[in-house]
Amino acid sequence: MAENTMWHETLHDQFGQYFAVDNVLYHEKTDHQDLIIFENAAFGRVMALDGVVQTTERDEFIYHEMMTHVPLLAHGHAKHVLIIGGGDGAMLREVTRHKNVETITMVEIDAGVVSFCRQYLPNHNAGSYDDPRFTLVIDDGVNFVNQTHQTFDVIISDCTDPIGPGESLFTSAFYEGCKRCLNPGGIFVAQNGVCFLQQDEALDSHRKLSHYFSDVGFYQAAIPTYYGGIMTFAWATDNDALRHLSSEIIQARFHAAGLKCRYYNSAIHAAAFALPQYLHDALSAQ
């Protein structure tokens, strides 16, 4: 791709977004997907897979803080964390900030993502790949959760959209495997797209997860990079109380963890579970 051109996202047929390409840093087709990182004056370094924006330096902190601190602080004493995907290292970066976590396992299907993100997205991983608690496994996520003998307190599915390599991470086989290796009272979370534009994705996840967990819901965050703005995250656990913890409890845990965030706080945590009526109506209609 030439520099000083426009890169157009291909996620939606009838509408979308574009980024000016100031400088292409990396572009390669791996065995699994088409990877590109380019620089944009407004959003910094932008990474896309198969024509879909995955992350930008400008706003990645919102996504990663919400996918890690919400389940970890709701759980309260997570020791073992599993990340599915997350090859850019930012999810790992946020989990490593929790000093009580003892092991962090990341399963990434594409070794190429990890290697080039270490070089081209250093602000994302911020040295977290060198944390002694971290183990990298190159494997298919569905295979791992159905075969591993390890168990986890929190599982974070940092999956791409349900197309291409990421499609298997939205299947019943994956959700069943996650339930299999989740400790009692554990929490599973996953990105579930922009619900206003991809509502079927959320409904499908809710329907499938409900077969394996007693408490299934969603929480949301405003992330400009993802077209439509309001990203939805799936939430699943067998401890019904964890979704309804008071902001005072979350604030106490947040303070004890010594965290300082740019987006996440205890009020955001509580408010994130307040969903728009159209989603409540759609879930009730299933």
Curated annotation (Swiss-Prot):
GO molecular function, one term: spermidine synthase activity
Sites where the protein binds S-methyl-5'-thioadenosine: 33, 108, 140-141, 165
Protein's pathway: Amine and polyamine biosynthesis; spermidine biosynthesis; spermidine from putrescine: step 1/1
A single cellular component GO annotation: cytosol
EC class name: transferase
Keywords: Cytoplasm, Polyamine biosynthesis, Spermidine biosynthesis, Transferase
Keyword Protease recorded: no
EC numbers on record: 2.5.1.16
UniProt subcellular location: Cytoplasm
UniProt binding sites for spermidine: 64, 88, 158-161
InterPro entries, sorted: PABS, PABS_CS, SAM-dependent_MTases_sf, Spermi_synthase, Spermidine_synt_N, Spermidine_synt_N_sf
Catalytic residue list: 158
Subunit details: Homodimer or homotetramer.
Similarity comment: family membership: Belongs to the spermidine/spermine synthase family.
Name of protein: Polyamine aminopropyltransferase
Designated gene of the protein: speE
